[in-house]
Structure formats: C-alpha cells, structure tokens
Amino acid sequence: MIHTLETTVAGRKMKVDFGKTGMLSNAAIFMSYGDTVVMINANASKEPREGIDFFPLSVEYEERLYSVGKIPGGFIKREGKPSDKSILHARSIDRPLRPLFPKGYRNDVQIVNTVLSVEQDNLPEILAINGSSLALCLSSIPFTTPVAAVSVGLVDGEFIINPTVAQRENTILDLTVCATKERVMMVEAGGQEIDEETMYSAIMFGFEECKNIVAFQEEAVAKFGKTKNEPVLYKADEEVEKEVKSFAFDMIKEAMYIMDKDERNAQLDKVKEKISEEFSEKYEDKVADIAEVIYKTQKEIVRNMLLNEDRRPDGRAFDEVRPISCEVGILPRTHGTGLFTRGLTQVMTVATLGALGDVQILDGIAEEESKRYMHHYNFPSYSVGEVRPLRGPGRREIGHGALAERALEPLIPSQSEFPYTIRLVSEVLSSNGSTSQASVCGSTLALLDAGVPIKRPAAGIAMGLITSEDLEKEKVITDIQGIEDFFGDMDFKVAGTEKGITSIQFDTKIKGLSNSCVKDALEGAKKARLHILGKIKECIPEPRKELSKYAPRTEIICIDPEKIRDVIGAGGKVINKIIADTNVKIEIKEDGKIFVTSNNEPEGVKKAISIIEGLTKEVVQGEIYLGKVTKTTNFGAFVEILPGKEGLVHISKLDFARVEKVEDVVSVGDEILVKVTDIDNQGRINLSRKDAIAKKEEEKDK
C-alpha cells in the first residue's frame, strides 16, 4: 500500500511517499522538497557481524547527473566513483545518526541515498539527512530517535531557513543544523567571519525548525512504522569483566595517570601483557571480551579524571592550549610552506600557485563548475607510529581537507586581486588530536609565506566534552588531544580569524549537546583561537611582498570583448601560436580580461601581451605604421602593420617615381613605413609608402 504524508518547511512542501518503491528493502521512501527528490533505502543484516569492535554503519550518497539533465563528461559517459562532495554529504548523514543506535549493536546497516531530481533552490543533501532518519524510524531496524536537518542562511541581518539559490548568493553564512527534538546533534558551517553570538543564535534558529520536522517524522512513524526488531547487543562476559577489572584496575589507573604519552602507552602495553599472562589460558576464547574490558576501564578512568577530579591526562588546565611553534619557508623550491606544531600534533602545509587554467573542473549536480582554491589533506600511517598500506585518500582525509578548505575560503583574495589558482596540501607528520584544525593553522602560514594577500590570518581549535551518564554534569575542554577525543563525547572544531568564525564542524558520541554546551564551546574556542593567532603573527605578521622566484608570474590586460575572437582565431589557431611562440599560459574571460602566465619566462609574458595588444588594436586611417612586407605580387606588396592585420601597397603607391617591378623597391621581410589611406566597408586596408615618406619629410621640414 502506498502512503503519502506532507508538511511545510520554509514555505515549501516537503512530501514523503513509501510503499511505492523498493518493495524488498526494509524501508524505502521517496522524499521530495519542491522539485528535489531523493530516494532512500535502509537495510540491516539479520545477524551481528562477528569479530569486530565497532558499529558497521555504511551511508552512501549517490548523485545521478540525470537529476539535473546532464550527461556525464569523459569517455565512459556514466557516473564513476563518488565525488568528494558526495563523500562529504554521506559523512554529514552518518554523523548525527550513528550515536542514536543502541550501544553494542553490531549488525551491518546500510543507508543508500540516491539523488533523482534536483531543483537548485532545494538542497538534496539536507533532504537526504531527513529522509535517512525517517527511513530508519519507519524500518524494523532498532533506531527510534528521529533527527531533522535544515540549512540556515544570513542575509541582511535576517536568518533564513533553507535559503534559495538567489539567497545563497547573498548569504554570509552557510549553516547546517541537525537535531532531535531535545538536543543539537551535529552542526556544519562556513561563514564570512561570523561573531560567536550570531553563530549561536543561528544554530538555535535552525534547532527550532528542526523540532517541527521531527514532529512530522514522529507522525509518520506512529501511523506507518514497522515493529522494531529486538537488537542483539554485544556485551563482554560478566565473569570476564569482573575478574579482569578486579585484577587490572589499579594498574591501568596508574598507567593512565602518566602525563607523557609515550611513557603512558609503554606502561599500558606492560599491563596488557600481565593481563594476557593471567587470563590467556582461562579465557582463551574470550580475547575480544578481555580487550573490551580493558577499553572500558581506560574510558572509565579518563572520564572520571576529567569529570570528577578536574584533571586532564597531560596536566593542563581545561582552557589551556598545548605549546605551539610555527615555522615558514622550510622547503627551498616550493612556493610557500608552513610548519605548525601543537603539542604532539604537527602539520606541514605546502602552497602551490598556478595559472587560472589550472582550476579544478567539477562535473556534478551543483551549478559550480570550477574551483580556483583547493586544499588536500594527507594522513599517513607514520603520523601515529603505525604501519599500513598507503592507498590514497579515504573518506576521513577528504572530509578533513574540505573542512580546512572551508575555513580559509572567505579569506582568499578574488581573482582580480590575485590572478592565480591556489592549491594547499597538508601533510600530517604527527597526530595527537585535532589535525584538521592544525591544517588550518599550517595553511595560513603557507599562504602568508607564498605571498597570497589573504584578508586576515585564520586558526582552528578543537573543543571536547565530558558528560555524566545522565547528561546532568558536563565539562567543556579546550584543545583536546587524542586520548580526550577517543574517550570523550564531542569533537567541536571551530576555525576563524580575530574578527569571527569561518567554519564549524561538530558532532557527538552522545544523544546531542545542551544549548549551554554549544555556547561554552564557541566562547572557549574564541579564546583559544586568539591565542593561536598571536603565535602565528609572531612568526609571520603579514603576507610576503614578493612571490617565490619559483612561482609563476601572471599579468592581466583588458580588451574589448568584441575582439576576443581576433585573439583566439579560427579554431584557436591564433592563440595556440602565441602560446607556442612565447611559452605562456593564456586564460580569456568573457568580460575581456586576459590572464597571461609564465613559470620562468617574464620576457615571454611581455611578448605575448605585445602580440595580443597588436591583435586587438584598431587600425586608424591616416596613421603611419612601421610594417613588414609579407608578400609581393605584380600589382603591389602586402604589408603586416599590426599582428594579424595586413594591407596592400599598390605598385603606384610604392614610390614617387614610376615603378616597373615591385621587387625593385621592396622585398619580402623588409620593414617599411606606410600610411593607411583607406579602409573599405569589407575591412580591407589600403596603404601608401609614398604618402608615408612625404609626411615624414614634411614633419622634418617643420
């Protein structure tokens, strides 16, 4: 049976159909918002997966280019692997849902979001979060707490829910809020230096709208939801837990109170060896249970230390940032480098400048077609002292790279101010928490070192949270390190300048954050950010005045847009010849701006500009030009007076005396003065050498 429910969000209709498609899925829904349609399918395995210590949730977000009436580019002409944006959207769906599954649930769960139709006013990724939550709630999978999502914009001082394309062009804030009816679950934001009070108000504004969508989901579940399966939850054997904890608690506690990370880990390894010696024979088939008890004991000790003893594992105050060092220019041949170290977290970011033709071309469902500024993040195994194959960037690397990219994006100079493509690559050299925000700091250092005139330096910080089981008691922590992130309840990343916030990403391991926690985290992040910015400015207070000698050089000229075809030529013949002759890159914009770039040949840039200026310069009747003879005939000589512009000197106009043969006066390759005597209605140019000589003689007499 087909069921349909509707509600209104921001003045537009949100509709859900189920029972219409995917008859064999546990739950399959068609969800639409305006003309944007996403199909969501949710399924779970019947039995828990054995031999794992995590919840195997898989979220897929598939963009179909037919949704915007496009055929994929390239040779194959079909969608390939997920784009970076699809991966980011899948992660955004995963983060608010994962904490709401029962603890110990080990069944494989897959949620597939397929984008079928897109109206650019209504973002499919926002619809997919709502649809994924609703599909899970309608299914028999043990997920019972609905989550809603909205986008919030800020235009002319007014908050807007789910802004349209026109509104997004003018907004200074791009915020996504996910929440249950009681608490905020996840936030992602990019903004043009938004102050903390405004950001908090925007989050709360989105939270209120989320409550209405949650109510809509609850109504659907009450009417049409399936009976929930009783989950089989993993739990360590009670006898194993009791014996191992009794034997090892004090030893683990002693190890966890060691402030130095290497010493602490070494001591923990010794404790684990003792536990293994004690129980390996008795519980040889309970190895996973023993590991689970050790993990739970460590977690209990660290959380108690933070929550009840007001003590951090490394002895810092709760609002204290780890020791910071900054360096620039450490690589001799790159265009800009920054090395940022915060405690045991260290990131080196390298900036590379390129021509405008080096932009990244995007082939997706969004209207954006290219990207001039990009940031890539690499997290090799050696950064945590481990050994594993290097197989290219995973979802985490793509997500962290995008987060740091968003933090700097509002500060990047415009194309007219700085006519270069900019690529940043952050190499994580050592990781002990908050590498994405260290990448923001490293990126700032690299951009300043490269001479990129960013508006202001930016820095990032990660805030953490520890809460009691009843959520009544909570402590916000500044600059979390690995152990606090691993055993804590929140990763609240905030980046920005001294003026305001440029990016936020936070998610939780619990069932949401209180409003006061959100506010405290924003204020704590501001204090820490200003401290870090001070350290960055001590290292390099402003962008370098000169680009690296190894960086390309770009010059800009402006021509009449009507003359663009003259520069390009038939089939690109003219522009390709200029590029080949001068060894430059040329980018032409529709408004007549031409960007000429060369890596190491400034003379090539000058020559190319001279040719382009000649091609676009108008031939003026009555003016005298120094031209080159390109061809002779029995009736005259053809002379090139400007690049690509030739005229005819009739044999009668070559000299004052009668000329019997053209070659008696001029030859191919000769440079001669000529005067433009006429330009006919077909654009043909008539020249006179005789009149040019006469005019020059006349000027001499004066």
From Swiss-Prot:
Catalytic activity: RNA(n+1) + phosphate = RNA(n) + a ribonucleoside 5'-diphosphate
A Pfam family recorded for this sequence: RNase_PH
One cellular-component annotation, GO: cytosol
Keyword Cell inner membrane: no
Domain KH: residue ranges: 552-612
EC number(s) recorded for this UniProt protein: 2.7.7.8
Localization in the cell: Cytoplasm
Job description of the protein: Involved in mRNA degradation. Catalyzes the phosphorolysis of single-stranded polyribonucleotides processively in the 3'- to 5'-direction.
Record protein name field: Polyribonucleotide nucleotidyltransferase
Source species: Clostridium botulinum (strain Hall / ATCC 3502 / NCTC 13319 / Type A)
Record lineage: Bacteria, Bacillati, Bacillota, Clostridia, Eubacteriales
